[in-house]
C-alpha cells in the first residue's frame, strides 16, 4: 500500500532506494508485482544483475554502486557471478603491434551465403574486417559468390564448385588446406537449412584441428537435436543464438526463452563446452562453470535484419586477432593464483568467453553510436559494421594514446566489475 501511495503522488518526491528498490526482483529486474519508482538507487559493492537491465531503469532511476568495506578475503571467497559488458571491457583490445602485418591479426574464414542468401555472409565478412582481422575469406557454393563479395575487393572468396548451388557433403581439399591457415571460422550466416548444409556442418565438425568457430544463424538450427555434434563443440567455440534459435536448440518456444533468460542461458551452456551468447536486449554471455557477462544496453539501432551476422563476424574477427594473446595472458594468470586482488578481479574467464563478451559490448556500443545520426532507426547492419572501428578507438585507446572520453551514462560506471 505504501509503494502504491508514493508512486501515485502527483508531485513526485525524490526517492532514494538503498540496495534495491522495494518490490523489485534483483535477478530479473521486474516488479513483484509492484515496486517503488526510485529517483536514484545506491547499491553496495556490486549491483544485482536485475538492476542494470534496461527495463529496470523505470524503477531504479540513476544507479550508483559504492564500496562499503567488504574485506578482501570475503570478496575472494564469494566472487561476483555477473560482470558488466560496458566500455571498460573494450580497453584490453587497444593493443596494436608496432611491427605487425596482416597475418599478425589473423585470417577469418566465413562459411555461409548460399545462393540468394549471400548478403548475410557479406555482413559477417565485412564485420570481421572492421573488427580488425588481417585477412578474410568467404567460402560458399559458387553460384552465390557475387552476392557475398558485393564489390568489396578486400573480401577474398573460395567458390565451392564454380556453378554449384549446394554445399558439398565432404570438405574439398582446398577448403581443408585453408582451414589449416585460418585463425577463426564463422559458420552459418545465410547458409540455408537444407540437408546439404546439415551434411556440410557435420563434416566440418568432424574435421581435426578445426580453428575456433563462431556458430550462428542456420548453423545453430542445424545443430538442434544433434547432441553428437554439440559434443564436438570446443571451449574456444562460440554459439550466438537469438531467442528463436535458442528455442530450437532447447526444444521449447521463444516465449519460454524470454520468460527467464538467465535460466535459458544456463540450459544452453549445458548443451556443450563452448561459449553461448544469448542475443537480445541486455545480451547474456555464458559458459559452463563460469560467471555470466551481461550487456546492460537496449539498442533500437540493432533491431534490423543482419545485425546478428555483424555480431558473428565481429566475434570471429576478435577471436582471430586476439585469441593467442588472451590465451597467453590467461595461462600467466593461472600460474599466479593470487592475481585476484578485489571484487573486480575474482575470476579469470576462458579466453573465448572474454572475447565473445567484448564482441557483444563492441557491437552494442557501435549500435548506440548510430543514434546520433539515426535516432529513430533507419540505419542498416552495414552501418553497424562500419561503426565498429570508430567505436573501438573511442573505448580502447592504445596506451600511447590519450585516454578515451567516455560518458558515464554510456559506461554505467561501477555497476558490475569487469574481470581483468
Where are these regions (language model features)?
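Short acidic catalytic loops
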Residues: 15-24, 185-188, 214-216
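Small-residue (G/A/S/T)-rich helix-start motifs and N-terminal tracts that mark the onset
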Residues: 38-40, 51-214, 221-238, 243-420
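Internal gly/pro-rich beta-alpha loop/helix module
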Residues: 1-79
